[in-house]
Structures are given as structure tokens and as C-alpha cells.
Amino acid sequence: MLIYDTKLKQKVPFEPLAPKKANIYVCGPTVYDDAHLGHARSAIAFDLLRRTLELSGYEVVLVRNFTDIDDKIINKAFKENKSIQELSSIYIESYTRDLNALNVKKPSLEPKASEYLDAMVSMIETLLEKNIAYKVSNGDIYLDTSKDKDYGSLSVHNSSIEFGRIGLVQEKRLEQDFVLWKSYKGDNDVGFDSPLGKGRPGWHIECSSMVFKTLALANTPYQIDIHAGGVDLLFPHHENEACQTRCAFGVEIAKYWMHNGFVNINNEKMSKSLGNSFFVKDALKNYDGEILRNYLLGVHYRSVLNFNEEDLLVSKKRLDKIYRLKQRVLGSLGNIDLNFKKEILECMQDDLNISKALSVLESMLSSMNEKLDQNPKNKALKGEILANLKFVEELLGIGFKNPTEYFQLGVKESEKQEIEKKIEERKRAKEQKDFIKADSIREELLNHKIALMDTPQGTTWEKLF
């Protein structure tokens, strides 16, 4: 298994800390709003990593957190007259619904920052005892980055550009020093009583503490195998996580770092400041979650994905082909084509090379359709095809529906009943040799994007996109 390590800037063999086990921490959302397509892409990217590792024989523990203590949450909670717990719970539920719709496997653990305050306080106390952290006059506590000789080694940033983002805070020793603890500032703030004084943790210390408490291995130079997240988190978040873990525990937080690329909307980086954020829940109003997943996984996880509906509809044709083949072979699972399994898995074992994997999939679909044309009643062949498609489902998380359900997506139950009535009406018209009426009914349904197919078993229908 090869993965691209952001720190080394190259593909490297994945050699876990424990044989055939993989511990992965994925930075989850700050839950002050609904999930956008960037969140969805990150979740799907590392869901693919997990699936690939599991099918390669690894025992995977994947932890994805919820940041439920943050300035944005506090500000919005006060604005909406809610507690931060109420607000964050709303968006945790929303995020979970969205990812379920996208067929993202549930993480092994989903810690909330608010559940690990003691661990955060303890870690900050360690940094204070080591004289690596310092308190300023308003009670805030910062980490002195000059004490970490490796600071900047992960992101390899340009300090004159990147540190300018952070801004100069009075009494900070260095501009790049970052906050570990924010003291309670009064009525429009949130604070927790602690040995550090009343206050709340900074963003970066939250993730480091959760990694330590949920995944960290003892007596190794690294706490976990893989730390993952969006490339926008590389600096300052992941850089600061790595720094404070080195300083507190004397080890690296992760052996490997993996980052997924941005999502652009019509060639512009998606951001709330530009007003072009695309919420997953809004996309799901127009497209089934499987169709959206199929599109988002179709571009290599490290590349920028330029979201547009034209490309989404083109990518849907791949799903259509899967379900067309599945439609032809409903029955019992047989023996998988071992060459196909090996070939597609090896593609994904090469840093999730999805373009090659999808090419292998397309070849299999074409080949199996040709074989079926020649041997339409061959049960062993049908069983093999179903086994191949089942492996695709397990590896890529697509193709898991019943074909009829898939081809009728987006049609309400009441509408289905009306369509069936029209089909019966058309059947009677044909029996009475009233072919003009029969054709009229077909055209009427087609105008509503419902296509009829006459088969030896009767008339079936599909929803057109």
C-alpha cells in the first residue's frame, strides 16, 4: 500500500506501527453550520482509504471528531439565543444525516471536544511545567513556538505570508505563537472552571488531546499511523497540533499525514466569504446521495475538484452502467473474478488511484456485458458478475441499491401509483388496438421524464435525468 505523505511530499509505503493495524484520525467539522461539499469530499476521501485498507487485510480504527467548542459556535449560539450544546447538537445531527446519505461508513469513534476538557487541561499544564507555554496578562495561554526546533516542518510555509494570517497579539513572544487556552472574557463568552482558570481550550489543543486519549500508542515514536484532513487544515491547524504534541510528549503525533484537495464551485474556491458554499443538504435535494458520492470520489483525492452539474451528470453514466449490468443478473452471488479484484484493489493501493480503478471497473462492465450477450442464461457467469459488483460496493461504496430503486430515484410514492395507473391505461388501449392513445400516454409520461420500456415480462419504467 502506497500513500502520499504530505510532510515528505512523496508517495511512501504504508508501514503501520502495529502489523496489519491502521489507526487513523480525521479532522471533522466545527459544528456551527451545515456540512458543505468540502466536508463531504474529505469524509468520502478517507472513507475510501479506510475501505481500501480493510479490503487489503488491515484492522482499521478510524476516529473523526466534532469540534463543538469554538468562537464561531459561541457567536452563533448567542445570536440565536441557544446554548453551544444545543447549537452543536443540531449540526452534529445534520452532518451525520448527510454522511449517511453519502454512504460514508460510521467512524470507530466520534469524540466531541467538550468531552475531553480534562485531557486538554492536563496537556496544557504539562506544557506550562516544561516552560514551553506561557500566560499573558488577560489569562490566555500561548505556546512558545521557539521552543520547538521542528516548527514549520510539516507545512513548510513562508512565514512572512502565513504568519500574517494569524495577526499579532499583544504580549505574544512570537507572531506564530498560538493560543492553548482562552480565558473567560465576560457575558458574551463561554468558560469552564479549571486549574488554568475559567476559560476554554484553543482549537489546536482539542485535536491533539483527542488523538492522545482515543488512539495514541505507547512506547512508539509516533502516537498514530495517519492524521488526515482537508488541505486547508495543513497550516496552522495541523502544524500546531504536531508542534504541541512534540513539546508535551516528546513524540510525533502521526507517522503519516494525508490531505485532500479543495472543492471549487465554477472554478472558484468554495468559501462562505465568497457566498458560494454548497451545502450537502441542498445538493441532496437535487441528487441522490449515491450519485453525489460517485461524483465526489471520481477525482483523485489530492486534486482540486471543480464542482459543476454537467460533470456530475456525466459521472452518473458510470452508475447507470453498473445498475444496467446488475439489472441483467439478479440472483445469487458466485465466485469473484480474482484478476478483476486484484487489479482494481492494486489501483486503490497506489495512493487511492481512482482514475485507474474506474478504468478497470469500466473494462469489467464492458467485458461482462459482452459475455452476457453471448451466454444470457449462464448462471455461473451471472454469479461472478454479482460477486464483482459486490466487491465494487465494498471498495467504492457505490452500486448497493436494487436496480429498480436506482432507476426510479426522485419519484414519490404517490407519483409511482399514478405512473402505474397510466401503464395500465396504456395496456388496455393497446389491447383495444387504440395505438394512438397508447402512444399518447407514452409521450405524456416522457414529457414528465418517465420513460417506458416494454419487455416480455411487461412494461417497466424509469426516471430520466
Swiss-Prot record:
Record keyword Calcium present: no
Short sequence motif 'HIGH' region: positions: 29-39
Positions bound to Zn(2+): 27, 207, 237, 241
Residue window of motif 'KMSKS' region: 269-273
Coiled coil segments of this chain: none
Superkingdom of origin organism: Bacteria
Gene Ontology annotations for the cellular component aspect, listed alphabetically: cytosol
CDD domains found in the cross-reference section: CysRS_core (cd00672)
Family the entry assigns: Belongs to the class-I aminoacyl-tRNA synthetase family.
Protein name: Cysteine--tRNA ligase
Organism from which the protein derives: Helicobacter acinonychis (strain Sheeba)
Top-level taxonomy: Bacteria, Pseudomonadati, Campylobacterota, Epsilonproteobacteria, Campylobacterales
